[in-house]
């Protein structure tokens, strides 16, 4: 009887979770992105993340006529601002914002440019500077991952749009 209750509980929990539309993040269907060229510096975190996410990608320095799509990272701007202050007037929370300016060069010669923005916040604690620095690093990493994901989705939609024409 106890085993039956456990099975019913697990079954009902899985039905509730699947019915609310919950699904795991992180996977992107990249079947149309077999070969992608990335124009950017190897020191650029976004370029490195793109190489990790797109297994058939290559990093190039100069853009030439290619039969593969090219992602060109034009510029990344980072800004940091105070979100809140405590009663003594010191910063309690910071927000980091990054804007990625990119250019997509598709195999048919079409060029698309755009901007992507992502931000994250973290708590600031003066007495724990090492932990605060780590929080800032984690926030920067999450912003870079979000921008990379958005850029891949933009490339995928641009490729689908040119294939449908």
Question: Where are the predicted features?
Answer:
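C-terminal motif of bacterial Sec signal peptides marking the signal peptidase cleavage site
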Residues: 16-19
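C-terminal/domain-edge helix-coil "capping" segments
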Residues: 130-165
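N-terminal segment of the mature soluble domain
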Residues: 29-77
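Bacterial N-terminal signal peptides that target proteins for export
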Residues: 1-8
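Bacterial signal peptide processing site
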Residues: 21-23
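Surface-exposed short loop/turn segments
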Residues: 56, 70-115, 121-137, 153
């Amino acid at each position: 009887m106890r085993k039956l209750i456990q099975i019913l509980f697990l079954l009902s929990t899985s039905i509730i979770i699947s019915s609310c539309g919950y699904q795991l993040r992180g996977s992107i269907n990249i079947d149309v992105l077999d070969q992608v060229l990335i124009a950017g510096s190897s020191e650029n975190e976004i370029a490195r993340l793109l190489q990790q996410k797109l297994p058939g990608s290559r990093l190039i320095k100069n853009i030439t006529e290619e039969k593969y799509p090219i992602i060109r990272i034009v510029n990344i701007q980072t800004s940091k601002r105070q979100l809140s202050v405590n009663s003594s007037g010191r910063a309690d929370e910071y927000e980091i914002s990054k804007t990625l300016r990119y250019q997509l060069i598709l195999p048919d010669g079409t060029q698309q440019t755009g901007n992507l923005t992502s931000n994250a916040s973290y708590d600031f604690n003066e007495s724990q500077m090492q932990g605060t620095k780590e929080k800032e690093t984690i926030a920067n990493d999450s912003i870079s991952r979000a921008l990379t994901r958005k850029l891949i989705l933009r490339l995928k939609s641009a490729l689908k749009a040119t294939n449908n024409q």
